[in-house]
Amino acid sequence: SISRRLGVSLRADMEWKVAKTATFEYITAQLEFSQQSSLSAILCDIPNIGKTFTARYYVQNHKNAVYIDCSQVKTKLKLVRKIAAEFGVDAKGKYSDVYEDLTYYLRSIENPLIILDEAGDLQYEAFLELKALWNATERSCAWYMMGADGLKEKINRSIECKKVGYTEMLSRYGDRYSKVTPDDGKEREAFL
């Protein structure tokens, strides 16, 4: 439809109020640090704690930061074209041209940050392409991957099975998973 192509909403969106919770503060601090230093990280935590809201809010208020819902762009082609489109790079045409234009653009702007939410939904080829994109933009672009505990399990299982690319990808994202909520059940309940 024309409204979809132009990005026009046909209904009023509910306005959300920002509650600066411990989750909001933690993720915002991580995103700011990542963007300012062009470092990458992975956040894996339980659902419904405000990860997505915080990431979207951050992108609205910070230059050169984009939010990608990976559950909507699971394939390599869709993912790269979506990232390009979010930065205003031409996402149509030959894939190789889109890829080259995107990596060139990311290396030429100041402190780009790409937030990959629901990253556990990405297909294997898309994960490999993230590694390639990271390599092509090293020290000039920050990448922040987010997901629930399933993302951590997917990466760990793939590393244990010696699936090509996962060990390298984890190392590029800091070799660890960050988490907001406490592991202990009683502490987590008090936190939430």
For the regions a protein language model found, what residue spans apply to each?
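A short, basic N-terminal segment
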Residues: S1-S38
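Conserved catalytic segments around the Walker B and adjacent sensor/switch elements
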Residues: H62-Q72
